[in-house]
Amino acid sequence: MAFTHEKIETKSWLMIALILVVIAFGGLVEIVPLFFQRSTTQAIEGVKPLTVLQLAGRDIYVREGCYNCHSQMIRPLRAETLRYGPYSVAGEFVFDHPFQWGSKRTGPDLHRVGGRYSDEWHRLHLRNPRDLVPESNMPAYPWLEKATVAADAMPAHLRALRRVGVPYSDDEIAGAADAVRGKTELDALIAYLQSLGLARK
């Protein structure tokens, strides 16, 4: 007599047991390999950790709330890729802690803004956006060119990021304060904006 599915379907406890075995096996096949990966997302070619000045700029970007109006994630939609460039992939964000994807766009997406405009354009735009884009509702940030970067805080910041997997070397950490000493917050923010999206064009 051949084995048929009818024997399983008519014995509810056997069917429940077999369902649990299949689910457990499927779960193991999906989950166990992740224990052997250092990271579930690998960096794409060309993605590097931010320099100390860029990292200081990222901190200013977060402090000033830029993420409330600008996203940093291009969705795989034709209209977005035509306007902003290639859609974002997970491997571009492996060194972002926390990532700056955003969920609202009052202003344009900034993920591929690096190299699109000159440093001077950014300087003028951050000083007073309406000088370059008359219809802009972005606030001006004139104080950024007067304030200097908190250089002494940077080594601890790099050490903290290294603890969560960003590959900063001991030399980079030791020289972090000197790398940004005397730089303005405007210089740092521009350096950060110019670094966005360069790994994938």
Model-derived segments and spans:
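Post-cleavage N-terminal segment of exported redox proteins
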Residues: 1-50, 164-169, 190-201
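Electron-transfer interface patches adjacent to heme c in soluble/periplasmic c-type cytochromes
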Residues: 15-24, 82-186, 200
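Short, solvent-exposed loop/turn and secondary-structure capping segments
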Residues: 27-34, 71-73, 78-83, 137-138, ...
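Short, well-ordered alpha-helical packing segments
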Residues: 29, 55-58, 111, 123
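Sequence context of c-type cytochrome heme-c attachment sites
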Residues: 34-46, 52-55, 71, 87-93, ...
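Electrostatic cytochrome c docking/interface patches
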Residues: 38-62, 74-81, 106-108, 176-179, ...
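The canonical Cys-X-X-Cys-His
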Residues: 57, 63-72, 189, 193
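Bilobed periplasmic-binding protein/Venus flytrap-like ligand-binding cleft at the lobe interface
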Residues: 61, 125-129, 191-196
